[in-house]
Design a protein with these regions (language model features):
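Alpha-helix C-terminal capping segments
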Residues: 1-4, 70-71, 161
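Active-site HxH/HxHxD metal-binding segment of metal-dependent hydrolases
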Residues: 1-38, 46-56
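Structured loop/turn residues at beta-strand edges in well-structured enzyme cores
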Residues: 3, 26, 43, 63, ...
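Cap/insert and terminal regions of metallo-dependent hydrolase folds
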Residues: 7-19, 86-173
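Residue-level signal for beta-strand positions within conserved beta-sheet cores that form or flank
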Residues: 24, 41, 164-166
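Short low-complexity, flexible loop/linker segments enriched in glycine and/or proline
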Residues: 24-26, 44, 150-152, 184-186
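Core dinuclear metal-dependent hydrolase active-site scaffold
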Residues: 31-97, 173-191
Length: 191
């Protein structure tokens, strides 16, 4: 995939792994929280906080976990990354004012992991705080790390969306999603 990639923007310390896998240094941009990278045609990526950890075993926390805001000439797209619930969402909402799409973690959670994975009971508050025009949830329906049913994350957020005026989009993996069509609907494919 590397030949098809223009730039890789990531948190501090992740670039060394990509370089090991053959990515040239001139394609790698590492950012600390609150730093941004300006790209061509008015695009900018800002690294923002997330609440997680990095690494496994004895080599933990040697790289930075992040969320990102992609700012285009006409849209703000927030990619929440792998994160537990935290108060920094209010700071992000204040800084960016309008968020057109929030892509948020929703799955592979446990009460024991609440600091690093958003719980279903916390997700509506995250969405309310960020106040995005549209929401897509990720980190679900692909692999199992937790003890909940594979479809539980989607069931819970779909129910919550109905009760909390959330413009939730649930495209099937690979299905086309049109950011400029807030009325686009998707079937509940997981049922």
């Amino acid at each position: 995939i590397e030949p098809k990639v223009g730039k890789v923007i990531t948190g501090l310390g992740v670039g060394e792994h990509l370089a090991y896998w053959g990515y040239p240094a001139d394609k790698l941009i590492e950012l600390d929280w609150q730093e941004n990278a300006t790209l061509a045609d008015g695009f900018m990526v800002t690294a923002l906080p997330a609440r997680h950890f990095s690494g496994r075993g004895l080599k933990r926390n040697q790289s930075l976990w992040s969320s990102f805001m992609l700012t285009t000439p006409s849209k703000n797209v927030y990619v929440g990354g792998d994160s537990g619930y935290a108060t920094f969402y209010a700071d992000i909402a204040k800084r960016f004012n309008t968020i057109d799409l929030a892509i948020l973690e929703n799955g592979q959670y446990s009460d024991n992991w609440a600091d690093i994975h958003t719980l279903p009971s916390q997700l509506p508050q995250t969405i309310k705080t960020l106040n995005p025009k549209q929401v897509v949830t990720v980190h679900n329906s692909k692999f199992v790390l937790a003890n909940h049913a594979w479809d539980e994350p989607l069931e819970k957020i779909a129910e919550s969306a109905k009760n909390n005026d959330i413009n939730l989009k649930t495209p099937m993996i690979g299905e086309i999603f049109y950011l400029d069509d807030p009325n686009q609907t998707f079937k509940a494919w997981w049922r």
